[in-house]
Amino acid sequence: MSQKTDAPLESYEVNGATIAVLPEEIDGKICSKIIEKDCVFYVNMKPLQIVDRSCRFFGSSYAGRKAGTYEVTKISHKPPIMVDPSNQIFLFPTLSSTRPQCGWISHVHVKEFKATEFDDTEVTFSNGKTMELPISYNSFENQVYRTAWLRTKFQDRIDHRVPKRQEFMLYPKEERTKMIYDFILRELGERY
């Protein structure tokens, strides 16, 4: 993994190569350390700002994605979020997103994780690199499983495995009557 030594970037959007967005203090200011498959670099934005910007880049906002997670899973504390549904980019926070120490991990890039001697978690990423994160093993495991559940629920919806709810469709009374009449005729025609 190469280390970029250039000046920090001013902005960034999470993408398929993003492994983690972690807080890093630079000159007394919280910035972000971006870990991608092949490189590490810094951005002059807080991790949550990058996550929100990335959600907006893909047509929503952090608040919108957080609300979407709640609608699907009822997870409200440290919810994982879907940044980009078309590219299967799901992130989960290491702590409460309101805390400046909160980092974000890309679910798809987590290959293995284990507890360390001091109750942190050592994570092996898809690029083969390992990193120790200041999060307990149980908390990290919980975040991984909750994100997997969110991914599965969204994928089921995308694959149409969840029945569509017809009550959201509003039709004028005449059309409803005709639809019911047509349905009855079809059912009777199939039976007789």
From Swiss-Prot:
<keyword id="KW-0678">Repressor</keyword>
<dbReference type="GO" id="GO:0003677">
    <property type="term" value="F:DNA binding"/>
</dbReference>
<dbReference type="InterPro" id="IPR010461">
    <property type="entry name" value="ComK"/>
</dbReference>
<comment type="function">
    <text>A master regulator required for the expression of late competence genes including comC, comE, comG and the bdbDC operon. Receives signals from SrfA, and possibly other regulatory COM genes, and transduces these signals to the late COM genes. Represses transcription of rok. May repress expression of a few genes.</text>
</comment>
<dbReference type="Pfam" id="PF06338">
    <property type="entry name" value="ComK"/>
</dbReference>
<keyword id="KW-0178">Competence</keyword>
<dbReference type="GO" id="GO:0030420">
    <property type="term" value="P:establishment of competence for transformation"/>
</dbReference>
<keyword id="KW-0238">DNA-binding</keyword>
<keyword id="KW-0804">Transcription</keyword>
<protein>
    <recommendedName>
        <fullName>Competence transcription factor</fullName>
    </recommendedName>
</protein>
<keyword id="KW-0805">Transcription regulation</keyword>
<keyword id="KW-0010">Activator</keyword>
